[in-house]
Protein backbone atom coordinates (compact mmCIF):
# COMPACT_ATOMS: atom_id res chain seq x y z
CA UNK A 1 0.00 0.00 0.00
CA UNK A 2 1.29 3.44 -0.92
CA UNK A 3 1.39 6.23 1.71
CA UNK A 4 -1.65 8.04 0.32
CA UNK A 5 -3.67 4.83 0.32
CA UNK A 6 -2.49 4.16 3.86
CA UNK A 7 -3.91 7.50 4.92
CA UNK A 8 -7.17 6.75 3.12
CA UNK A 9 -7.50 3.49 5.03
CA UNK A 10 -6.89 5.26 8.34
CA UNK A 11 -9.52 7.88 7.55
CA UNK A 12 -12.05 5.31 6.35
CA UNK A 13 -11.46 3.16 9.40
CA UNK A 14 -11.89 6.07 11.80
CA UNK A 15 -15.21 6.95 10.17
CA UNK A 16 -16.70 3.47 9.92
CA UNK A 17 -15.09 0.88 12.17
CA UNK A 18 -12.91 2.81 14.59
CA UNK A 19 -15.13 2.31 17.61
CA UNK A 20 -13.12 1.57 20.72
CA UNK A 21 -9.94 2.87 19.12
CA UNK A 22 -8.59 6.33 19.79
CA UNK A 23 -9.68 8.71 17.02
CA UNK A 24 -6.62 10.80 17.89
CA UNK A 25 -4.35 7.82 17.23
CA UNK A 26 -6.07 7.08 13.94
CA UNK A 27 -5.85 10.69 12.84
CA UNK A 28 -2.18 10.81 13.76
CA UNK A 29 -1.58 7.72 11.66
CA UNK A 30 -3.31 9.33 8.70
CA UNK A 31 -1.27 12.51 9.08
CA UNK A 32 1.95 10.51 9.31
CA UNK A 33 1.07 8.61 6.16
CA UNK A 34 0.33 11.85 4.32
CA UNK A 35 3.65 13.32 5.48
CA UNK A 36 5.47 10.27 4.15
CA UNK A 37 3.50 10.64 0.93
CA UNK A 38 4.55 14.27 0.59
CA UNK A 39 8.18 13.57 1.37
CA UNK A 40 8.30 10.72 -1.12
CA UNK A 41 7.67 13.14 -3.98
CA UNK A 42 5.26 10.67 -5.49
CA UNK A 43 1.78 11.57 -6.62
CA UNK A 44 -0.98 9.27 -7.83
CA UNK A 45 0.26 7.29 -10.77
CA UNK A 46 3.82 8.46 -10.18
CA UNK A 47 6.83 6.21 -10.05
CA UNK A 48 9.58 5.75 -7.54
CA UNK A 49 11.63 2.94 -6.04
CA UNK A 50 8.85 2.31 -3.54
CA UNK A 51 6.42 1.66 -6.38
CA UNK A 52 7.98 -1.79 -6.74
CA UNK A 53 7.45 -2.93 -3.18
CA UNK A 54 4.44 -4.13 -1.25
CA UNK A 55 3.69 -1.68 1.57
CA UNK A 56 0.61 -2.69 3.60
CA UNK A 57 1.06 0.05 6.20
CA UNK A 58 0.71 -0.46 9.96
CA UNK A 59 -1.47 -3.31 11.28
CA UNK A 60 -5.18 -2.44 11.40
CA UNK A 61 -7.66 -4.84 13.01
CA UNK A 62 -10.74 -4.03 10.93
CA UNK A 63 -12.53 -7.25 11.83
CA UNK A 64 -15.70 -8.57 10.21
CA UNK A 65 -17.64 -11.63 11.38
CA UNK A 66 -18.52 -14.38 8.88
CA UNK A 67 -21.53 -13.52 6.75
CA UNK A 68 -20.75 -9.85 6.11
CA UNK A 69 -18.67 -10.24 2.94
CA UNK A 70 -19.65 -8.06 -0.02
CA UNK A 71 -19.49 -11.21 -2.17
CA UNK A 72 -21.83 -14.14 -1.64
CA UNK A 73 -21.95 -17.58 -3.23
CA UNK A 74 -22.92 -16.29 -6.68
CA UNK A 75 -20.47 -14.76 -9.12
CA UNK A 76 -20.39 -10.95 -9.10
CA UNK A 77 -18.25 -8.82 -11.42
CA UNK A 78 -15.84 -6.30 -9.87
CA UNK A 79 -14.00 -3.72 -12.00
CA UNK A 80 -10.22 -3.45 -11.99
CA UNK A 81 -9.50 0.14 -10.95
CA UNK A 82 -5.73 0.06 -10.47
CA UNK A 83 -2.78 -2.22 -11.15
CA UNK A 84 0.76 -1.72 -9.89
CA UNK A 85 3.75 -3.90 -10.65
CA UNK A 86 5.58 -4.75 -7.42
CA UNK A 87 8.14 -7.18 -8.85
CA UNK A 88 9.07 -8.72 -12.18
CA UNK A 89 6.33 -11.34 -11.77
CA UNK A 90 3.86 -9.91 -9.24
CA UNK A 91 1.19 -7.22 -9.37
CA UNK A 92 -0.96 -5.47 -6.79
CA UNK A 93 -4.50 -5.27 -8.14
CA UNK A 94 -7.23 -3.02 -6.80
CA UNK A 95 -10.86 -3.92 -7.58
CA UNK A 96 -13.80 -1.61 -6.96
CA UNK A 97 -16.81 -2.28 -4.74
CA UNK A 98 -20.22 -0.72 -5.25
CA UNK A 99 -21.61 2.02 -3.01
CA UNK A 100 -18.27 2.66 -1.30
CA UNK A 101 -18.69 -0.31 1.01
CA UNK A 102 -15.85 -2.32 2.54
CA UNK A 103 -15.15 -5.92 1.61
CA UNK A 104 -16.30 -7.25 4.98
CA UNK A 105 -14.23 -10.43 4.68
CA UNK A 106 -13.51 -12.37 7.85
CA UNK A 107 -9.87 -12.94 8.84
CA UNK A 108 -7.97 -15.51 6.75
CA UNK A 109 -10.94 -16.07 4.45
CA UNK A 110 -10.43 -16.00 0.69
CA UNK A 111 -12.31 -15.04 -2.44
CA UNK A 112 -12.72 -17.21 -5.51
CA UNK A 113 -11.80 -15.43 -8.75
CA UNK A 114 -13.00 -16.52 -12.19
CA UNK A 115 -11.42 -15.64 -15.51
CA UNK A 116 -9.72 -17.11 -18.57
CA UNK A 117 -11.80 -20.25 -18.06
CA UNK A 118 -10.39 -21.08 -14.62
CA UNK A 119 -11.22 -20.47 -10.94
CA UNK A 120 -8.60 -19.80 -8.27
CA UNK A 121 -8.67 -18.71 -4.59
CA UNK A 122 -7.06 -15.43 -3.55
CA UNK A 123 -6.73 -13.87 -0.10
CA UNK A 124 -6.98 -10.06 -0.21
CA UNK A 125 -4.07 -8.16 1.35
CA UNK A 126 -6.10 -5.01 2.04
CA UNK A 127 -8.13 -4.75 5.23
CA UNK A 128 -11.82 -4.07 5.79
CA UNK A 129 -10.80 -0.50 6.67
CA UNK A 130 -10.47 0.21 2.95
CA UNK A 131 -13.78 1.52 1.60
CA UNK A 132 -14.99 1.02 -1.95
CA UNK A 133 -12.25 -1.40 -2.99
CA UNK A 134 -10.10 -4.39 -2.09
CA UNK A 135 -6.60 -5.43 -3.14
CA UNK A 136 -5.05 -8.69 -4.28
CA UNK A 137 -1.32 -9.38 -4.45
CA UNK A 138 -1.03 -11.74 -7.42
CA UNK A 139 1.97 -13.77 -8.45
CA UNK A 140 1.99 -14.12 -12.24
CA UNK A 141 3.02 -17.62 -13.28
CA UNK A 142 3.98 -18.52 -16.89
CA UNK A 143 1.44 -21.36 -16.82
CA UNK A 144 -1.11 -19.44 -14.73
CA UNK A 145 -4.01 -18.55 -17.03
CA UNK A 146 -5.93 -16.50 -14.46
CA UNK A 147 -2.93 -14.65 -13.02
CA UNK A 148 -1.79 -13.69 -16.53
CA UNK A 149 -5.34 -12.64 -17.38
CA UNK A 150 -5.63 -10.31 -14.38
CA UNK A 151 -2.14 -8.93 -14.96
CA UNK A 152 -2.93 -7.86 -18.53
CA UNK A 153 -6.63 -6.92 -18.79
CA UNK A 154 -7.32 -3.20 -19.32
CA UNK A 155 -8.18 -1.00 -16.35
CA UNK A 156 -11.98 -0.89 -16.16
CA UNK A 157 -12.37 -4.54 -17.16
CA UNK A 158 -14.13 -6.82 -14.69
CA UNK A 159 -13.27 -10.09 -12.97
CA UNK A 160 -15.89 -12.33 -11.36
CA UNK A 161 -15.62 -13.04 -7.63
CA UNK A 162 -17.56 -14.98 -5.03
CA UNK A 163 -17.08 -16.06 -1.43
CA UNK A 164 -17.86 -19.42 0.13
CA UNK A 165 -18.03 -19.01 3.94
CA UNK A 166 -16.94 -22.59 4.66
CA UNK A 167 -13.45 -21.92 3.29
CA UNK A 168 -12.43 -20.28 6.58
CA UNK A 169 -10.41 -22.95 8.38
CA UNK A 170 -9.58 -20.92 11.47
CA UNK A 171 -10.93 -17.58 12.63
CA UNK A 172 -9.71 -14.71 14.78
CA UNK A 173 -9.35 -14.70 17.76
CA UNK A 174 -7.16 -17.73 17.27
CA UNK A 175 -7.29 -20.49 19.89
CA UNK A 176 -3.65 -20.14 20.95
CA UNK A 177 -1.32 -17.88 22.90
CA UNK A 178 1.62 -18.63 20.60
CA UNK A 179 1.37 -19.05 16.84
CA UNK A 180 3.88 -20.18 14.25
CA UNK A 181 3.24 -19.25 10.62
CA UNK A 182 5.08 -21.03 7.81
CA UNK A 183 4.69 -19.55 4.34
CA UNK A 184 6.08 -20.48 0.97
CA UNK A 185 6.04 -17.90 -1.82
CA UNK A 186 2.70 -16.13 -2.20
CA UNK A 187 1.42 -18.23 0.71
CA UNK A 188 2.20 -15.20 2.89
CA UNK A 189 -1.02 -13.46 1.79
CA UNK A 190 -3.44 -14.99 4.35
CA UNK A 191 -0.90 -14.26 7.05
CA UNK A 192 -0.97 -10.56 6.16
CA UNK A 193 -4.65 -10.66 7.17
CA UNK A 194 -3.94 -12.69 10.32
CA UNK A 195 -1.15 -10.34 11.41
CA UNK A 196 -3.33 -7.28 10.87
CA UNK A 197 -5.85 -8.83 13.26
CA UNK A 198 -3.36 -9.98 15.91
CA UNK A 199 -0.99 -7.01 15.95
CA UNK A 200 -3.67 -4.42 15.33
CA UNK A 201 -6.06 -5.52 18.09
CA UNK A 202 -5.61 -3.61 21.37
CA UNK A 203 -5.13 -6.01 24.25
CA UNK A 204 -4.14 -9.00 22.13
CA UNK A 205 -1.07 -10.63 23.66
CA UNK A 206 -0.59 -13.48 21.18
CA UNK A 207 3.05 -14.12 20.28
CA UNK A 208 3.69 -14.84 16.60
CA UNK A 209 6.65 -16.17 14.64
CA UNK A 210 6.49 -16.04 10.85
CA UNK A 211 8.91 -18.13 8.79
CA UNK A 212 8.70 -17.26 5.09
CA UNK A 213 10.56 -19.10 2.33
CA UNK A 214 11.12 -17.50 -1.08
CA UNK A 215 13.31 -18.22 -4.08
CA UNK A 216 14.99 -14.80 -4.32
CA UNK A 217 14.86 -11.39 -2.66
CA UNK A 218 12.71 -10.15 -5.54
CA UNK A 219 10.14 -12.81 -4.66
CA UNK A 220 9.99 -11.78 -0.99
CA UNK A 221 7.39 -9.09 -1.62
CA UNK A 222 6.42 -8.42 1.99
CA UNK A 223 9.78 -8.80 3.72
CA UNK A 224 10.20 -5.07 4.40
CA UNK A 225 6.70 -4.79 5.83
CA UNK A 226 7.16 -7.83 8.06
CA UNK A 227 10.53 -6.56 9.28
CA UNK A 228 8.96 -3.18 10.10
CA UNK A 229 6.11 -4.83 12.00
CA UNK A 230 8.58 -6.96 13.94
CA UNK A 231 10.72 -3.93 14.80
CA UNK A 232 7.71 -2.12 16.26
CA UNK A 233 6.09 -5.06 18.07
CA UNK A 234 7.93 -7.32 20.50
CA UNK A 235 5.26 -10.02 20.12
CA UNK A 236 6.12 -10.61 16.47
CA UNK A 237 9.22 -12.16 14.95
CA UNK A 238 9.78 -12.54 11.19
CA UNK A 239 12.32 -14.88 9.60
CA UNK A 240 12.86 -14.92 5.84
CA UNK A 241 14.97 -17.51 4.05
CA UNK A 242 15.89 -17.50 0.36
CA UNK A 243 16.50 -20.70 -1.58
CA UNK A 244 17.88 -19.44 -4.91
CA UNK A 245 19.29 -16.00 -4.24
CA UNK A 246 22.30 -15.36 -6.51
CA UNK A 247 25.70 -14.90 -4.94
CA UNK A 248 27.08 -12.27 -4.62
CA UNK A 249 23.99 -10.44 -3.46
CA UNK A 250 22.98 -7.61 -1.15
CA UNK A 251 20.91 -10.11 0.83
CA UNK A 252 22.44 -10.73 4.27
CA UNK A 253 19.64 -12.83 5.76
CA UNK A 254 19.14 -16.58 5.90
CA UNK A 255 19.59 -18.84 2.90
CA UNK A 256 18.52 -22.38 2.18
CA UNK A 257 15.39 -24.48 2.24
CA UNK A 258 13.24 -25.00 5.29
CA UNK A 259 14.18 -28.06 7.29
CA UNK A 260 13.53 -29.59 10.69
CA UNK A 261 16.50 -27.83 12.25
CA UNK A 262 15.33 -24.36 11.15
CA UNK A 263 11.73 -24.96 12.20
CA UNK A 264 12.73 -26.31 15.60
CA UNK A 265 14.96 -23.29 16.17
CA UNK A 266 12.28 -20.68 15.51
CA UNK A 267 8.79 -22.15 15.93
CA UNK A 268 7.09 -22.27 19.33
CA UNK A 269 7.46 -25.78 20.80
CA UNK A 270 4.71 -28.43 20.48
CA UNK A 271 2.99 -27.66 23.79
CA UNK A 272 -0.64 -26.74 24.60
CA UNK A 273 -1.86 -23.31 23.41
CA UNK A 274 0.40 -23.43 20.35
CA UNK A 275 -0.94 -23.32 16.80
CA UNK A 276 1.00 -23.76 13.55
CA UNK A 277 -0.42 -22.29 10.33
CA UNK A 278 0.93 -23.46 6.95
CA UNK A 279 0.34 -21.96 3.50
CA UNK A 280 2.27 -22.40 0.28
CA UNK A 281 2.77 -24.60 -2.77
CA UNK A 282 2.01 -28.35 -2.75
CA UNK A 283 5.66 -29.28 -2.19
CA UNK A 284 5.70 -27.28 1.05
CA UNK A 285 2.67 -29.14 2.41
CA UNK A 286 4.14 -32.49 1.39
CA UNK A 287 7.33 -31.80 3.29
CA UNK A 288 5.89 -30.15 6.39
CA UNK A 289 2.49 -31.64 7.11
CA UNK A 290 1.12 -33.77 4.28
CA UNK A 291 -1.21 -32.83 1.41
CA UNK A 292 -3.42 -29.82 2.01
CA UNK A 293 -6.67 -31.70 1.43
CA UNK A 294 -5.80 -34.59 3.76
CA UNK A 295 -6.64 -34.15 7.47
CA UNK A 296 -3.90 -36.43 8.76
CA UNK A 297 -0.62 -34.86 9.83
CA UNK A 298 2.60 -36.21 8.35
CA UNK A 299 6.01 -34.81 7.50
CA UNK A 300 8.43 -32.65 9.44
CA UNK A 301 5.87 -31.07 11.78
CA UNK A 302 4.66 -34.46 12.97
CA UNK A 303 8.26 -35.55 13.49
CA UNK A 304 8.83 -32.44 15.61
CA UNK A 305 5.99 -33.48 17.93
CA UNK A 306 3.04 -31.34 16.83
CA UNK A 307 -0.41 -32.90 16.81
CA UNK A 308 -2.98 -32.90 14.02
CA UNK A 309 -5.11 -30.42 15.95
CA UNK A 310 -2.21 -27.97 16.25
CA UNK A 311 -1.48 -27.68 12.52
CA UNK A 312 -3.83 -25.78 10.20
CA UNK A 313 -3.32 -26.29 6.47
CA UNK A 314 -4.49 -23.16 4.64
Task: Tell where the protein language model's regions lie, with residue ranges.
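Conserved S-adenosyl-L-methionine
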Residues: 176, 199-208
